[in-house]
Amino acid sequence: MKTHKALAYFLLLQLHGSLLAEQKERSPNIVILMADDLGYNDLSAYGHPKIKTPVLDQLAREGVKLTSFYAGATVCTPSRMALLTGAYPARLGWSKGVIGHIMKKGQGLSPDALTMPEIFKAAGYRTAMFGKWHLGDEPPLRPHQQGFETTFYLNKSNNQTKELWRDDEV
């Protein structure tokens, strides 16, 4: 009887050890937040004395808080392109913002550009995008063709459209 208890205890310890090892091997969750027209000091986590952002403050406390910022552009579309690709927008064919905020047919983030979500997906991550896309209205320029598996987004600025897209359907 003692042998069975000792064996069961030993197996339980082995199982516990393998579960701990599995937890250590898991990749971290990565959440990237991008907001148009948000300055460095606009969140309480970064020192704003009056604006309270408790949820973002908690994310900053429990995650990695970045304190050196570089933007690929000063306006939304090329800045998003720079964030997603790591390339200067001019190298992707964008040197300024979207004229009149409406893209021409076929205009957007090139499907040939390698994106961060494509790299994460290849490394076994699940990818998602929620919010404003404004990097191309039609296939192959939509988020699903740029590496995102799950999406819920506006294709343009909300002053141009109220259509919400979920996983490539209105």
Where are these regions (language model features)?
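Formylglycine-dependent sulfatase
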Residues: 2, 20-170
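Bacterial N-terminal signal peptides that target proteins for export
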Residues: 1-8
